[in-house]
Amino acid sequence: MGEVRRVSIDTPIEELLSILDEDAGLVIEDVLNSESLDLIKNDLEPFLNVTKNGQDAFTGYETKRVGALMARSKTCQDLALHPLINEMAGIFLGPHCENYQLHFSSAIQIGSGESSQILHRDRGVWGGYIPRKIETQFSTVWAITDFTEENGATQVVPGSHKWDKNRQPLPEEVAYAEMKSGSVFIYTGSVLHGGGTNNTEQQRLGVFLHYAPNWLRQQENQYLSYPPEIAKEFSPELRSLIGYSKGGYVLGFYTDPTDMEGKLESVSPEKIFGDSQDRYSTLATPENLVQGSSKK
């Protein structure tokens, strides 16, 4: 059987990124304390109680999914902004973007009797149009309960991010991201993975927070999940992370359709909240635009 490497929170970031480059997945153990775990469980319980199971084999007939986590759990906001995770995401995605954004948030609860999910690569959400050499996703799964092979721990095929797209793994190449509650599994958008089979009476609960380059469309529509009247309650850092910021000098501006005085014409999204604006808030020079047209 394949193996997912497990490391401690004080492991040097260079080593973490080296493992991610080699295997496309690793577990950092004991990141969250019991208080944080209890807060997340309490925040999510009302939504999980009323959410219906999936309606197909991929989403899982015994699996519940709850999104819009930034609006539903303050502690999940803290996870999204976790300093180590964001530092790793910035370095990992950095070769292919100026900055990154929150791409997806979901609490996924695999119930008793659930069957395993088909192995897949998350980068497929963009339809296969992006060259494989561009890594599009830095993903995290926070274990709110223990993850075991028996209760549906994520299946993953270490090293499969370097395979031909049509190669299928042998049974002995599949590993399980087993971890204690409070740990986090980090993986890439190019590695084969999928939810596991739950042969227990337990519920396996994880918080999935994924990051992507800020020039790509997000899987979870952040602006409908968190419209301005909700996003105004977030910190400026979280607003920027979910996309209320520009991704380049002329990427991501907005215009107020009700503005009859021309005050909010093609401005940076931060302006709507009165936040400090970033380096893209100034007018681009012709040199900026020309240099930004190609990295070669």
Residue ranges and their predicted role:
Residues 1-23, 29-119, 123-129:
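Non-heme Fe(II)-dependent double-stranded beta-helix
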Residues 27, 101-103, 156, 186-187:
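A structural signal for short, well-ordered beta-strand segments and their strand-loop junctions
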Residues 33, 77-81, 133, 175-178, ...:
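Aromatic-acidic/polar surface patches that form glycan- and anion
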Residues 104-107, 140-142, 207-211:
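A structural signal for short, well-ordered beta-strand segments
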Residues 113-178, 216-226:
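Catalytic core of non-heme Fe(II) oxygenases with the double-stranded beta-helix
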Residues 167-186, 191, 196-296:
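Conserved double-stranded beta-helix
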